[in-house]
C-alpha cells in the first residue's frame, strides 16, 4: 500500500516485482507466484526463501522451458514463513491441493483417466464416474484415477447391487419412491426413508472398496453379520451376508497379485531421456494391483531421483490420508527422502517408509514398473514427433517462417442470435492448452434474439482479444521485441499471449470481418490469420479469393480441423450453459423495470406467465405495482414489432418525440 500514499510516486509493475524480490526473507517457507489477473501460477517451498525465489529471475538459461514460460507471467510474489522445511512441505501440499496452480502440474497425464467422485458435501451424497477433477466443495472426494474404465464401471455396477445407494441425481417422483426402492437398490433418499447419518455410514463402506481396503471392509462386515446373528436379527444378518458375497465378486477381478499379500505399497519407476520422463505409479493393496497411473514429466536438467520426488510431492498432496500406503518403493534414491517420509507420516498419521529396494523380489517389481515406463516414454515421444510434423506441415501450407507454437481457434455459437457467445481455444505444440481457453459473451446490442450476425460477432471478439496489444503498439512499443521476450512481466506489463497463428471457423466472409477488425487495431500486418470452412475443409488466407491447395487428410489440415472442432465444442457447451441459465430465470426478469418483488406480485396476481402474456395493457395496468408505462413495457416485451422490438416504452416515447420535433 505504500506505493499509493499521497506524495509517493507510483511504481510500475516491474519495479514493484523487483522491490518484492528484495523483501523476501532468508527463512524456510512457501512462496506463491501470481500473474497480472491475480491467478496463482505456482506454489513452491524452500529452506531459504530468498535464494530460491531469486534464482528464478537471475539467469533463465538454467531453467526448463516450462519454468521460463512461468516466470515471464509473474507479476506478484507472496511468501509465508514457516518454522521448518518439513512444515513448509506440509503447507505447500495444502496450498497446491486448494488452488491447483497450473505450473505445479509437473505431470502431464498420459490420458484423461476417470475418477470416482463421492459428493460428501451433500446430505445424501451421489457417487459417479467423472473425468473432470473439479472440487465443488472441499468435502467432496475423488478416488483414482483409474486406468481401466471398464473395470471401474463394472465395480461401480456391482457396488450398487451390493449396497443400497442413491441411484438418480434428481427424484423421479416428488411424492413417492421409484422402482429402485421397491427392489432394494435404493434406500429411498428422495423421500428420506433413511437418515442422512445412516446413509453416510453405508457410503463410508463403499468408499473403502475404492480405497483398496476391501480386506478391512470384509472383516467389518463379518463382525456386523455375527452381531446381527447373536441378536437373532437374521434378516439383517442375511443382508450383510449378501454384501460379503458381493464383495468377494468385486475383489476377484484383480489381475495381478504378489506373494506378500499383507503389504500395501505404491511402486514408482521412470524411463527418461534428456528432455522427457515417463513415470509409472503402481498401486498395490493387500498384494493386489488396484491401480496404475502413467505420466510424462519435463526432465530437462532434473535428476531421476528429483523427478520421482516431485511426482511424490504432487501426487500425495492430492489424495486423502487413507490413500497413502505404509510403504513406497522407488527406483532411485530421493534427494530429500527423510523429509518426505516425515511429511507422509504426518499426513497418514501412521508410519510411512520409502525404500529403494535391492533384494530380488522388490527389485523385480521395480523392473516391471520400469518396463511399463519405457513403453510409455516411447509412446509419448512418438506423439511429440507426430505433433511436430503437424506444425511443420501447417507452416509449409500457410507459408509461415517457423512452425506455429501457439495457435488460437475461434468460433461463434447462438440460436438465431439468442445467447450469442464465442470461444477461444489454444493449442500449444499441437496439443490443447485448456488453461488458456477463454469464453466471451457477445456484447453487441445488434446481436440478440432474432437478429444474428456472425461477422459482427467475430469482429467484436477480435477487438476485445487484441486491444491490449493494439494499445501497446499505439504507445510505440515494438511488438516484435515483446513477442521475442515472450511477454516477460518485468518488461512488458504482463503481455504474454501473442499467438503464432489465429484460425477462424468459417469461410471468406468471417475472415474478411476479422481482418477489418484487425485493421482498425492496426494489427493486420502483425498477425498470421487463416480460416477453415466447414463443408469442404477448405483453408482460406486473407486477400485470397480461392482456398489453398490442400488435402483434407494432410497433417497440417488435420491439426486445423482438430482446433476447429475443439473451438466449436467449447462454444456450443458455453452457449448451452448460458441458455440453460437464462431459461431457469423467469422471462419476466428480462423486462426493464421489473424487480424481484414485482415479478412475485405479477405471478401471484395472474398465476402464470401465459396469463400475463395474453393480458391487455389495460388489464396489466390494474395489477398491483404496475402503472400504465410499465404495463406498456410488459406488453411490448411479449408482443414485439419490427420497430419496437424489445425497447421500453419510455425509450420509444423519446424517439417519437425526437422524430416529431
From Swiss-Prot:
GO terms for biological process: nucleotide-excision repair; SOS response. Pfam families: GIY-YIG (PF01541), HHH_5 (PF14520), UVR (PF02151), UvrC_RNaseH (PF22920), UvrC_RNaseH_dom (PF08459). It comes from the Bacteria. Its main location: cytoplasm. One of its GO terms (molecular function) is excinuclease ABC activity. Keywords: Cytoplasm, DNA damage, DNA excision, DNA repair, Excision nuclease, SOS response. The UvrABC repair system catalyzes the recognition and processing of DNA lesions. UvrC both incises the 5' and 3' sides of the lesion. The N-terminal half is responsible for the 3' incision and the C-terminal half is responsible for the 5' incision. Belongs to the UvrC family. NCBIfam families: PRK00558.1-5, uvrC. Interacts with UvrB in an incision complex. This is UvrABC system protein C. The lineage of its organism: Bacteria, Bacillati, Cyanobacteriota, Cyanophyceae, Synechococcales.
Amino acid at each position: 500500500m505504500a506505493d499509493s500514499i499521497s506524495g509517493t510516486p507510483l511504481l510500475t509493475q516491474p519495479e514493484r516485482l523487483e522491490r518484492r524480490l528484495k523483501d523476501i526473507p532468508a527463512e524456510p517457507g512457501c512462496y506463491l507466484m501470481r500473474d497480472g489477473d491475480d491467478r496463482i501460477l505456482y506454489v513452491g517451498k524452500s529452506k531459504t526463501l530468498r535464494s530460491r525465489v531469486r534464482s528464478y529471475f537471475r539467469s533463465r538459461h538454467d531453467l526448463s522451458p516450462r519454468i521460463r514460460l512461468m516466470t515471464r507471467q509473474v507479476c506478484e510474489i507472496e511468501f509465508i514463513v514457516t518454522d521448518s522445511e518439513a512444515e513448509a512441505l506440509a503447507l505447500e501440499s495444502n496450498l497446491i491441493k486448494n488452488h491447483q496452480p497450473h505450473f505445479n502440474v509437473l505431470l502431464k497425464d498420459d490420458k484423461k483417466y476417470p475418477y470416482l467422485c463421492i459428493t460428501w458435501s451433500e446430505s445424501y451424497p451421489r457417487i459417479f464416474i467423472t473425468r473432470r477433477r473439479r472440487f465443488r466443495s472441499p468435502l467432496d472426494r475423488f478416488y483414482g484415477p483409474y486406468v481401466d474404465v471398464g473395470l471401474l464401471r463394472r465395480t461401480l455396477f456391482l457396488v450398487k447391487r451390493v449396497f443400497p445407494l442413491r441411484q438418480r441425481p434428481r427424484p423421479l417422483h416428488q411424492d413417492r419412491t421409484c422402482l429402485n426402492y421397491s427392489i432394494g437398490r435404493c434406500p429411498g433418499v428422495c423421500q428420506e426413508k433413511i437418515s442422512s447419518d445412516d446413509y453416510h455410514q453405508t457410503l463410508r463402506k463403499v468408499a473403502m472398496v475404492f480405497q483398496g481396503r476391501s480386506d478391512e471392509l470384509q472383516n467389518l462386515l463379518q463382525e456386523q453379520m455375527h452381531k446381527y446373528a447373536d441378536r437373532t436379527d437374521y434378516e439383517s444378518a442375511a443382508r450383510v451376508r449378501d454384501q460379503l458375497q458381493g464383495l468377494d465378486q468385486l475383489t476377484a477381478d484383480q489381475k495381478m497379485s504378489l506373494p506378500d499379500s499383507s503389504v500395501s505399497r505404491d511402486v514408482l519407476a521412470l524411463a527418461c531421456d534428456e528432455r522427457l520422463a515417463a513415470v509409472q505409479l503402481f498401486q498395490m493393496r493387500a498384494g493386489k494391483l488396484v491401480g496404475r497411473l502413467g505420466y510424462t514429466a519435463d526432465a530437462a536438467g532434473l535428476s531421476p531421483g528429483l523427478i520421482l520426488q516431485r511426482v511424490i510431492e504432487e501426487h500425495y498432496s492430492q489424495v486423502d490420508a487413507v490413500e497413502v500406503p505404509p510403504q513406497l518403493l522407488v527406483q532411485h534414491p530421493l534427494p530429500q527422502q527423510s523429509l518426505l517420509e516425515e511429511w507422509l507420516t504426518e499426513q497418514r498419521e501412521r508410519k510411512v517408509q520409502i525404500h529403494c529396494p535391492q533384494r530380488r523380489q522388490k527389485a523385480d517389481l521395480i523392473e516391471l514398473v520400469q518396463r511399463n515406463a519405457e513403453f510409455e516414454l516411447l509412446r509419448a515421444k512418438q506423439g511429440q514427433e507426430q505433433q511436430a510434423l503437424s506444425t511443420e506441415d501447417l507452416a509449409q501450407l500457410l507459408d509461415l517462417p517457423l512452425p506455429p507454437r501457439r495457435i488460437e481457434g475461434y468460433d461463434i455459437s447462438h440460436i438465431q442470435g439468442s445467447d450469442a457467445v464465442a470461444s477461444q481455444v489454444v493449442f500449444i505444440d499441437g496439443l490443447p492448452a485448456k488453461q488458456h481457453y477463454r469464453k466471451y459473451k457477445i456484447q453487441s446490442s445488434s446481436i440478440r434474439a432474432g437478429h444474428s450476425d456472425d461477422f459482427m460477432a467475430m469482429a467484436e471478439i477480435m477487438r476485445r482479444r487484441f486491444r491490449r496489444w493494439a494499445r501497446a503498439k499505439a504507445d510505440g512499443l515494438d511488438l516484435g521485441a515483446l513477442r521475442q521476450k515472450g511477454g516477460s512481466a518485468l518488461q512488458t506489463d504482463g503481455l504474454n499471449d501473442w499467438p503464432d497463428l489465429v484460425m477462424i471457423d468459417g469461410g471468406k466472409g468471417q475472415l474478411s470481418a476479422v481482418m477489418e477488425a484487425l485493421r482498425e487495431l492496426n494489427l493486420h500486418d502483425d498477425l498470421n490469420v487463416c480460416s477453415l470452412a466447414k463443408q469442404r475443409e477448405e483453408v482460406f488466407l486473407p486477400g485470397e479469393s480461392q482456398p489453398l491447395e490442400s488435402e483434407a487428410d494432410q497433417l497440417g489440415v488435420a491439426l486445423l480441423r482438430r482446433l476447429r472442432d475443439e473451438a466449436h465444442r467449447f462454444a456450443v457447451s458455453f452457449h448451452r450453459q448460458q441458455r440453460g441459465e437464462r431459461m431457469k430465470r423467469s422471462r419476466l426478469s428480462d423486462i426493464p423495470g421489473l424487480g424481484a418483488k414485482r415479478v412475485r406480485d405479477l405471478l401471484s396476481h395472474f398465476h402464470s406467465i401465459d396469463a400475463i402474456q395474453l393480458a391487455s395493457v389495460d388489464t396489466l395496468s390494474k395489477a398491483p405495482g404496475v402503472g400504465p408505462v410499465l404495463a406498456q413495457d410488459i406488453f411490448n416485451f411479449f408482443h414485439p414489432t419490427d420497430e419496437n422490438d424489445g425497447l421500453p416504452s419510455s425509450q420509444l416515447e423519446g424517439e417519437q418525440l425526437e422524430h416529431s420535433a
